[in-house]
């Protein structure tokens, strides 16, 4: 089926919505403001001001509207390297963040999430903000409310896979880059034909290093990608991604604790060594490896405790 997509101004979008009202469809896809069906063509208008025409008459129908549009204006100059565009917090953005990288137990968990300007008031009302000071119960409560309404993708690198990749010479930065890139790609596919105005990654490596890590990937997301530390405070999309990632991490943690029969602690401090030693004593080193990042110093410390 042929697809034609045009970008219109807000007034044209409203005019189209009224024009197609007699042909309107009751069900709207995510991000749509109207949907209609005429003989040989389906029309869907999105909040992003993109309008998609599908069907044998799609191109002809689209041309009727293209003829009414003012001339396209040239884009503003690109911003300086490392600087976010003006009014960035109000833009429609995919944000991505990760958790679990500093924890001996548990998987690295990455989430990419899309938040548009219209969704922001609701997300703020639901409690979405920088989650660093939040406790797990609050994280879980908010995540369960926002996951049905926020387009997102969560990817986990389970401990056995993590250990395998690490032994093959891959560092954490490389693993995170792969997960971020794929999670963002997944969200872009979910949103199509809508495109975000920007993508913001909570920075864990320099831009050049990040893309070097992805050099062998068949698909690399580069367009409109920005990197910033403390990105949770710069856009709600990163705050939402962080909350969802942590929720999934907590779920994985709870499942592992249930499986091994011991409450597993987060972090990588001395309290973690004691629990790891208990697992070695009860089940052996191989079992510990199923739930941990083996190259952490905690492994050797736990072995010493277990031998006492």
Curated annotation (Swiss-Prot):
GO BP term, example: mismatch repair
UniProt keyword Nuclease present: yes
Span of domain RNase H type-2: 91-308
Localization per Swiss-Prot or TrEMBL: Cytoplasm
Keyword hit for Nuclease: yes
Reaction equation(s) it catalyzes: Endonucleolytic cleavage to 5'-phosphomonoester
Gene Ontology cellular-component annotations: cytoplasm; ribonuclease H2 complex
Predominant localisation class: cytoplasm
Enzyme Commission number(s) of this protein: 3.1.26.4
InterPro entries linked: RNase_HII/HIII (IPR001352), RNase_HII/HIII_dom (IPR024567), RNase_HIII (IPR004641), RNase_HIII_N (IPR024568), RNaseH-like_sf (IPR012337), RNaseH_sf (IPR036397), TBP_dom_sf (IPR012295)
Top EC class of this enzyme: hydrolase
GO MF, any single term: RNA-DNA hybrid ribonuclease activity
UniProt: a divalent metal cation binding residues: 97-98, 202
Cofactor note: Manganese or magnesium. Binds 1 divalent metal ion per monomer in the absence of substrate. May bind a second metal ion after substrate binding.
Function: Endonuclease that specifically degrades the RNA of RNA-DNA hybrids.
Name the record gives this protein: Ribonuclease HIII
Source organism of this protein record: Listeria innocua serovar 6a (strain ATCC BAA-680 / CLIP 11262)
Higher taxonomy: Bacteria, Bacillati, Bacillota, Bacilli, Bacillales
Gene designation: rnhC
């Amino acid at each position: 089926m042929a697809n034609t997509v045009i970008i219109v101004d807000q007034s044209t979008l409203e005019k189209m919505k009224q024009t197609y009202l007699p042909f309107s469809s009751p069900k709207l896809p995510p991000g749509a403001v109207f949907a209609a069906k005429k003989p040989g063509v389906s029309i869907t208008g999105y909040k992003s001001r993109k309008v998609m025409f599908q069907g044998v008459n799609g191109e002809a129908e689209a041309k009727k509207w293209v003829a009414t549009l003012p001339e396209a204006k040239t884009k503003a100059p690109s911003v300086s390297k490392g600087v976010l565009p003006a009014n960035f917090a109000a833009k429609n953005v995919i944000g991505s963040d990760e958790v679990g990288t500093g924890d001996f137990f548990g998987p690295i968990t990455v989430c990419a999430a899309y938040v548009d300007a219209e969704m922001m008031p609701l997300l703020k009302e639901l409690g979405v903000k920088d989650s660093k000071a939040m406790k797990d119960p609050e994280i879980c409560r908010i995540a369960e409310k926002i996951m049905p309404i926020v387009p997102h993708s969560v990817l986990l690198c389970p401990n056995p896979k993590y250990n395998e990749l690490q032994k093959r010479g891959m560092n954490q930065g490389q693993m995170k880059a792969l997960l971020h890139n794929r999670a963002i790609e997944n969200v872009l596919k979910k949103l199509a034909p809508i495109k975000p105005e920007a993508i913001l990654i909570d920075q864990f490596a320099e831009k050049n290093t990040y893309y070097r890590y992805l050099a062998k990937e068949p698909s690399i997301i580069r367009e409109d990608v920005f990197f910033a530390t403390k990105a949770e405070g710069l856009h709600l999309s990163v705050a939402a991604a962080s909350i969802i990632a942590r929720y999934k991490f907590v779920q994985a943690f709870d499942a592992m604790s249930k499986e091994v029969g011991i409450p597993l602690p987060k972090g990588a401090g001395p309290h973690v060594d004691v629990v790891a030693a208990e697992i070695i004593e009860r089940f052996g080193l191989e079992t510990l490896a199923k739930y941990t990042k083996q190259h952490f110093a905690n492994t050797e410390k736990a072995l010493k405790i277990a031998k006492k």
